[in-house]
Amino acid sequence: MEGVLYKWTNYLSGWQPRWFLLCGGILSYYDSPEDAWKGCKGSIQMAVCEIQVHSVDNTRMDLIIPGEQYFYLKARSVAERQRWLVALGSAKACLTDSRTQKEKEFAENTENLKTKMSELRLYCDLLVQQVDKTKEVTTTGVSNSEEGIDVGTLLKSTCNTFLKTLEECMQIANAAFTSELLYRTPPGSPQLAMLKSSKMKHPIIPIHNSLERQMELSTCENGSLNMEINGEEEILMKNKNSLYLKSAEIDCSISSEENTDDNITVQGEIRKEDGMENLKNHDNNLTQSGSDSSCSPECLWEEGKEVIPTFFSTMNTSFSDIELLEDSGIPTEAFLASCYAVVPVLDKLGPTVFAPVKMDLVGNIKKVNQKYITNKEEFTTLQKIVLHEVEADVAQVRNSATEALLWLKRGLKFLKGFLTEVKNGEKDIQTALNNAYGKTLRQHHGWVVRGVFALALRAAPSYEDFVAALTVKEGDHQKEAFSIGMQRDLSLYLPAMEKQLAILDTLYEVHGLESDEVV
């Protein structure tokens, strides 16, 4: 639904007419329909807001997220307000109904998992006691052999029960936290949902060229937002893809700074006024890099040599694409999209055994995104979100965006450490994972979580299987050009990721937000 409503702005301007659009469970507003291509001035998520009808004014309605966001609106007539109330209520009900069943199942399985982990702690205490008892019997000699046999039998039984309970924990995790549930993007982030769906296609569908991938992405976006690509935008995408292919052949140091995400607004609308200027800047970068290259010899591509795409080069949004804002500000939307893009690496390591790690990573991304969508105009950078919660004295409250970002950066450090091990030539995936875990997450985990991770390590794939999973086209991993391409892509990806994590580390250290809590 769309139309004009009056929105309360401030005491100076009072009620001002704005053009509102209800689409995909999100109510957004603009100055006018003609200015919609510039992007919305604000939006509110219907699934999490309250709809209140004014007790006196029969043309007024209020949309409220308590403590976060307030929309005071007036319709031009009672009948028009009624139409909006029906549309807003229906959007809220549909979103709630579709999520209720899955959320209920998710909550039940989470509680079951917590219960099993409590049992694990109990069995651990019993094991410690029984080991001490066994030591006592051993030191007293063999005079009471019958008691020694009983203690040994009891210890063996407890060990078996402990392992069985641990196995049940993994079964619950496998049954509860499937890929579909983990990838479920919170309503209100259409761009992230679009990016997520295209990432899932890459390991399965061979993509012959970059243009074909972009058209597939556009189709996905249009399916959810009811848009059409016009001729000008199609030409723009073709030109940009030809530039990308040319840049890969000339110089590996060129990153795709002119990512198509820069031309997509929060509501999925394409910004047109900067398109040709971006192409000119990109072309200038290509000309300059052709004469001033600083790549290593093995990274350079001779003209005509095969360029094989990898998982990292086909990402729609990558950490290497992110341009920092003023004062090293990390753009929130681009960062979260890049986090979603790297999550499939855990699937390639084992979608079942790494489900708890993946669940934690995606859950933290969603928590930060939920904070972001409450006020996209204000929370343009991660720093602004953290500082807002610091000033409100809620930064260290459980489930806050600041806490979620803390665990998110820890999880990203683990992935970065693992990929660094692989890039440096480690051929044993178990060793690479263990080294990365020991340097990053291990210090923050208790013995139960460490045990689960140790169990997951045993199911890690071989180096050949993991590398094969990073290909876009089946069989590419057997080519020498693919190994060179992996080195090239990781040499761009990992330093950019490290730089942004270092900025977040500094932010948390300055404000004393790091935590020694063990989970």
Swiss-Prot record:
GO MF annotation: an example: glycolipid binding
Positions of post-translational Phosphothreonine modification: 139, 153
Gene Ontology annotations for the cellular component aspect, listed alphabetically: cytosol; Golgi apparatus; Golgi membrane; nucleoplasm; trans-Golgi network
Cell compartment(s), UniProt: Golgi apparatus, trans-Golgi network membrane; Membrane
Limits of the PH domain: 1-93
Entry-linked Pfam families: GLTP (PF08718), PH (PF00169)
Effect of residue 368 to E: In a breast cancer sample; somatic mutation
Result of altering residue 18 to L: Abolishes binding to phosphatylinositol 4-phosphate, less association with Golgi and no preference for TGN location
Residues recorded as bearing Phosphoserine in the entry: 145
Assigned keywords, A-Z: Golgi apparatus, Lipid transport, Lipid-binding, Membrane, Phosphoprotein, Protein transport, Transport
Quaternary assembly: Homodimer. Interacts with ARF1; the interaction together with phosphatidylinositol 4-phosphate binding is required for FAPP2 GlcCer transfer ability.
UniProt remark on domains: The PH domain of FAPPS binds the small GTPase ARF1 and phosphatidylinositol-4-phosphate (PtdIns4P) with high selectivity, and is required for recruitment of FAPPs to the trans-Golgi network (TGN).
Name listed for the protein in its UniProt record: Pleckstrin homology domain-containing family A member 8
Organism in which the protein naturally occurs: Homo sapiens
